[in-house]
């Protein structure tokens, strides 16, 4: 009797436990949390990019703005400026010289890269909105490119004023980020901070399309050449593949959009009102034709590989840590 009772109680408990397990709804991802994760990961990637690539970017900007006629000339000028400093050693002053104007990208890097990677995630959702349920989750090359282009639209609102101040700092003797921003606003109003926005979007729209698509394609190809993990196990981040794919993405983008970046830099460094057409004509006539649109290409490409390798490594490792610690 007691044995039957205990058995029935045991089976009842098992049934209740089973029914509770079956009725428990699956844990859904929190959109707000996912957005925050995208912002944080993008910001980490951006900080990595700035510290890796800023010296190359400084040289590129000086070549594009006509302050140096070659990479060697730009480097020589920076070292000469360091020699004129009274305080500090030549080495420390040279390091400071190569990181001149680093504050604007550092201040703007978190929102720029956060918005960019968040925008890419939003873009992926938009381009796959009409996909059939149960179909493949993999994006086509066209969908990747479209999502990348979409990411550039909100990013331009942050990128344009930040790069405007950065270019002014790198090409003049304005003391600090705040001082340069104040001078720009004083001379031309708030709208002056957004000078070159159209050129920025013209660069970053197709540039981001190529950037994200080439990264995804390169990473997927490189990963496909590696032995697969056991089913059900999360694959660790392959640092080499991520860095190679990130470097390829950066170089592909800069090769494609470099002439537009030269026009943008010319517009943002100018103290007079110009449009893209007049800036293009001026560059063509004064800098020897087509080659005038490619000054500083060497340092830009030298910068793009390590900087973008660092960007995507920072993003991927941050997402990996989020997953590892259940964030």
Curated annotation (Swiss-Prot):
Its main location: mitochondrion. GO terms for biological process: carnitine transmembrane transport; fatty acid metabolic process; mitochondrial transport. Keywords: Membrane, Mitochondrion, Mitochondrion inner membrane, Repeat, Transmembrane, Transmembrane helix, Transport. GO terms for cellular component: mitochondrial envelope; mitochondrial inner membrane; mitochondrion. It is a multi-pass membrane protein. PROSITE patterns: SOLCAR (PS50920). Solcar repeats lie at residues 33-126, 139-221, 237-321. The chain crosses the membrane at residues 33-49, 107-123, 141-162, 196-212, 244-260, 293-313. It is found in: Mitochondrion inner membrane. One of its GO terms (molecular function) is carnitine:O-acyl-L-carnitine antiporter activity. Pfam families: Mito_carr. Residues 1-29 are annotated as: Disordered. Residues 1-11 have a biased composition (Low complexity). Transports carnitine, acetylcarnitine, propionylcarnitine and to a much lower extent medium- and long-chain acylcarnitines. Belongs to the mitochondrial carrier (TC 2.A.29) family. This is Mitochondrial carnitine carrier. It comes from Saccharomyces cerevisiae (strain ATCC 204508 / S288c) (Baker's yeast). The gene is CRC1.
């Amino acid at each position: 009797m007691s044995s039957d009772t205990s058995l029935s109680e045991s089976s009842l408990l098992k049934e209740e436990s089973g029914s509770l397990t079956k009725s428990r709804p699956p844990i859904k991802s929190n959109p707000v949390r996912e957005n925050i994760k995208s912002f944080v990961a993008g910001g980490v990637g951006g900080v990595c990019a700035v510290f890796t690539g800023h010296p190359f970017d400084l040289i590129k900007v000086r070549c594009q703005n006509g302050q140096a006629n070659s990479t060697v000339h730009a480097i020589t000028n920076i070292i000469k400026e360091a020699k004129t400093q009274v305080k500090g050693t030549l080495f420390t002053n040279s390091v400071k010289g190569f990181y001149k104007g680093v504050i604007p990208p550092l201040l703007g890097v978190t929102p720029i890269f956060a918005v960019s990677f968040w925008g890419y995630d939003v873009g992926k959702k938009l381009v796959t909105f009409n996909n059939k349920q149960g179909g493949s989750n993999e994006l086509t090359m066209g969908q990747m490119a479209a999502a990348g282009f979409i990411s550039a639209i909100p990013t331009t609102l942050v990128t344009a004023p930040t790069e405007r101040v950065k270019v002014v700092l790198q090409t003049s003797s304005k003391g600090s980020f705040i001082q340069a921003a104040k001078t720009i606003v004083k001379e031309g109003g708030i709208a002056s901070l957004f000078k070159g926005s159209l050129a920025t979007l013209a660069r970053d729209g197709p540039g981001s399309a190529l950037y994200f698509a080439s990264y995804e394609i390169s990473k997927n190809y490189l990963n496909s050449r590696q032995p697969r993990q056991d089913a059900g196990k999360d694959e660790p981040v392959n640092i080499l593949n991520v860095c190679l794919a990130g470097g390829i993405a950066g170089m592909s983008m800069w090769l494609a959009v470099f002439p537009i970046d030269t026009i943008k830099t010319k517009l943002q460094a100018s103290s007079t009102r110009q449009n893209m057409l007049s800036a293009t004509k001026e560059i063509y006539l004064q800098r020897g034709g087509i080659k005038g649109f490619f000054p500083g290409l060497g340092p830009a490409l030298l910068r793009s590989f390590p900087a973008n390798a660092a960007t995507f490594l920072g993003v991927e490792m941050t997402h990996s840590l989020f997953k590892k610690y259940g964030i």
